[in-house]
Amino acid sequence: MSDTTSTIIFEHPLNEKMRAWLRIESSLQQLTSQRHLNSLASSLAFFRTITELLEVLERGEVRSELLKELERQQAKLKQWAEIPDVDINIVNSFRLKLKERAIALSKAPRLGQSLKEDKIISLVRQRLSIPSGCCGFDLPTLHLWLHLPQSERDKMVAFWIDSLLPLQQALDSILELIRQSAIFRSEISKNGFHQNTAEGADLLRLRLPLTPLLFPQISGHKTRFAIRFLPLDSEKGSVPAHLPFELACC
């Protein structure tokens, strides 16, 4: 992805829960952008993303963790509503949205189950781990499916993506609030290194100038973190002795 912005935001999870949520968010965003399947290449990219998403969903208690977080965020909003001069209408609107997200998520079938049981998805998943294992002679079912009218394939893809809607809406609401929970503060790294504490934070967000083409290498956990800034060009690039950047511990 490229654009003309002068800054770039990097994010780093400080616990396994946030790591899984960011991976799920990334997969859901990819599925949305890949949903127009008009070739074997675009279809395999879509099915590969579904496979990666299902693997993440199978590893932990994603639904229960999200429901706990929705409840925690509602409790925080309830406290905010008691702050003098707060816009009570905005706070109540967010609380209502979180409540609706929690109800929809709790009532939804097992996350990803309908995708796992789908015949086309199941057949492709079995072949994706085999190098070039999705040729027409390997998957005649997929070969035939790709020759269905585009409208029929679009309808099936829409059904698959819509089955993930309770998950996507709950996760989007949670991550929006977490990202907005802390403001960016100015920091300066010395000789390409910075360390600090992040008590109670789930997510680090760094905003860097696009030039001089540096990226952060972050190590950390729920209480402390360290950032090493490295040049994109490891041979010719360099890191300023004092690098200004912005940091938010969310």
UniProtKB/Swiss-Prot annotation:
The name this protein goes by in its record: Cell division protein ZapD
InterPro entries in the cross-refs: ZapD, ZapD_C, ZapD_sf
Localisation: Cytoplasm
Membrane spanning stretches: none
Domain of life: Bacteria
Record key words, sorted: Cell cycle, Cell division, Cytoplasm, Septation
Its biological purpose: Cell division factor that enhances FtsZ-ring assembly. Directly interacts with FtsZ and promotes bundling of FtsZ protofilaments, with a reduction in FtsZ GTPase activity.
Family label: Belongs to the ZapD family.
Signal peptide: none
Subunit structure: Interacts with FtsZ.
HAMAP family named in the record: ZapD
Gene Ontology biological process terms in this record: division septum assembly; FtsZ-dependent cytokinesis
GO cellular component, as recorded: cell division site; cytoplasm
